Amino acid sequence: MFQTFVRFFTTKEVRNKIFFTLAMLVIFKIGTYIPAPGVNPEAFNHPQGSQGATELLNTFGGGALKRFSIFAMGIMPYITASIVMQLLQMDIVPKFTEWAKQGEMGRRKINNVTRYFAIILAFIQSIGMAFQFNNYLKGQLIIEKSVMSYLLIAVVLTAGTAFLIWLGDQITQFGVGNGISLIIFAGILSTLPSSLEQFAQSVFVGQDDTSLAWLKILGLIVALILLTVGAIFVLEAKRKIPIQYAKKQSAQRLGSQATYLPLKVNSAGVIPVIFAMAFFLLPRTLTLFFPKAEWAQNIADTANPSSNIGMIIYVVLIIAFAYFYAFVQVNPEKMADNLKKQGSYVPGIRPGEQTKKYITKVLYRLTFVGSIFLAAIAILPIIATKFMGLPQSIQIGGTSLLIVIGVAIETMKTLEAQVTQKEYKGFGGR
């Protein structure tokens, strides 16, 4: 492991990309401390302040929401917009479906529309959030309560989201890994110390016998280890489908090529978890604009992962998004076609349509197992807080852990691939 990190920093171009990525994430973190204009940063020191904040948004945004900073909206409007755009491509909007089939050019068009939609959504949610938080904090959040003040706050928060989208694009283009994922990753890690502090306080406060408190902490450590092992397994486990070559001349390539087709147990990675949590935020938008409407509050209460119905919905969403994105990441038809063109086949399976059906069947089974594991890891901390009396601060711990591990694994793979590429170029004398 140490030698791997040494390789990262001894390769100049990769080292520069790492430093660039870290610099962008530092800018993100600094922005979480810059308060939006016209708000009172001390308002969240109100006794009810921490309860009024949406813990998920605050965690993903690196604590920006509880400070009501310029990045208070975070990157979630973009993720929500991405969900909607992905669904609209499923023959709902013919133009989007057409773009999805146009390759790189089509993806650029879809990405542009996604960004515009995210900006509109961020503006709408910013206005509602300013009203809701000011009401919840008994009018202490907004200093000057005027239409212009609310509009200014909404514009600034929307600009903050737009800047984070741009920042993510810069990391993706000039840095290491997926920029949006790394921003969420950095946000979760930056809130970890405060979450641990809250957990420790909730465990020790009011305890005459500290042995029980230490037992809970030990239990949390063991649970974290088990969840980490489980997360790595579900994100990295593969099913190897054996491949054989029909042409004799292809035998010369066997020494340099894998003779199996690897399919991940969870091809979608942590995207289903992120999208499922983002989906839960949509009904809460109703309460931003209808704070006194009982029907809106009932919908928001139902769309809460900690409620009984909410947990079921959360699991169903994770499984649904896992299947959806598994077939986005893996195209059985294209895979079968490529195998046929290469003169290779799965033993006992005819090339072409039969191979496509076989890969589809295997992918369905793998995704079922992977999505169940994914959902279990995500909801176990919620169950622990609900039925075992553990503090609320660890409620989204499973979701956060999955995202952190998933992003870390993918970033490490990206770094290793870039280092290997540079080393091969070096051997080639370039």
UniProtKB/Swiss-Prot annotation:
Alphabetized PROSITE patterns for the sequence: SECY_1, SECY_2
Membrane topology, record value: Multi-pass membrane protein
Subcellular localization: Cell membrane
Gene Ontology CC terms: plasma membrane
Keyword Transmembrane helix: yes
TM annotation in the entry: 18-38, 68-88, 117-137, 147-167, 174-194, 217-237, 270-290, 308-328, 368-388, 389-409
Keyword hit for Transmembrane: yes
SUPFAM superfamilies: Preprotein translocase SecY subunit
Keywords: Cell membrane, Membrane, Protein transport, Translocation, Transmembrane, Transmembrane helix, Transport
Biological processes, Gene Ontology terms: intracellular protein transmembrane transport; protein targeting; protein transport by the Sec complex
HAMAP family reported in the protein's UniProt record: SecY
Family membership: Belongs to the SecY/SEC61-alpha family.
Protein purpose: The central subunit of the protein translocation channel SecYEG. Consists of two halves formed by TMs 1-5 and 6-10. These two domains form a lateral gate at the front which open onto the bilayer between TMs 2 and 7, and are clamped together by SecE at the back. The channel is closed by both a pore ring composed of hydrophobic SecY resides and a short helix (helix 2A) on the extracellular side of the membrane which forms a plug. The plug probably moves laterally to allow the channel to open. The ring and the pore may move independently.
Self-association and partners: Component of the Sec protein translocase complex. Heterotrimer consisting of SecY, SecE and SecG subunits. The heterotrimers can form oligomers, although 1 heterotrimer is thought to be able to translocate proteins. Interacts with the ribosome. Interacts with SecDF, and other proteins may be involved. Interacts with SecA.
NCBIfam families hit by this protein: 3a0501s007
Protein name: Protein translocase subunit SecY
Annotated organism of origin: Staphylococcus epidermidis (strain ATCC 35984 / DSM 28319 / BCRC 17069 / CCUG 31568 / BM 3577 / RP62A)
